[in-house]
């Protein structure tokens, strides 16, 4: 299983995905709860790889994760350029707009909730695509 992490200062997006690209969990947590949540997810889903974005806080998060998890879990960083914009588009695929929102062009729609968990999914997908 692979855990995706979109690290941030205030909140972090997390997703757990099978190698078959089936999403088994996705959530957004406060940054101060991220390490304990990752530890729980690693035990619950037998995570062997963490894929995280390479944004501004990634170095700090990398060291936090490595110092709080067993060495058997690999941690890799991946380019997260444009991942938030891509996650907004993915949000509308996962939750098609209703009512008035249907006539608003997709580029003008803003999801009604954070998309950090979807970014975490996209980071895993980017990682898996890098092998094809």
Where in this protein do the model-derived segments appear?
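Phosphate- and other anionic-substrate recognition elements at nucleic-acid/protein interfaces
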Residues: 1-5, 9-132
């Amino acid at each position: 299983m692979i855990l995706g992490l979109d690290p941030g200062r205030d909140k972090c997006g997390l997703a757990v995905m099978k190698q078959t690209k089936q999403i088994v969990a996705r959530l957004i947590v406060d940054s101060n709860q991220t390490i304990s949540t990752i530890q729980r997810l690693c035990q619950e889903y037998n995570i062997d790889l963490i894929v995280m974005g390479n944004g501004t806080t990634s170095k700090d998060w990398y060291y936090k994760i490595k110092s709080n998890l067993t060495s058997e879990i690999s941690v890799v960083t991946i380019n997260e350029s444009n991942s938030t914009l891509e996650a907004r588009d993915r949000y509308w695929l996962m939750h098609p707009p209703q009512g008035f929102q249907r006539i608003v062009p997709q580029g003008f729609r803003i999801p009604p909730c954070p998309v950090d968990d979807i970014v975490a999914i996209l980071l895993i997908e980017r990682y898996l695509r890098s092998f094809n």
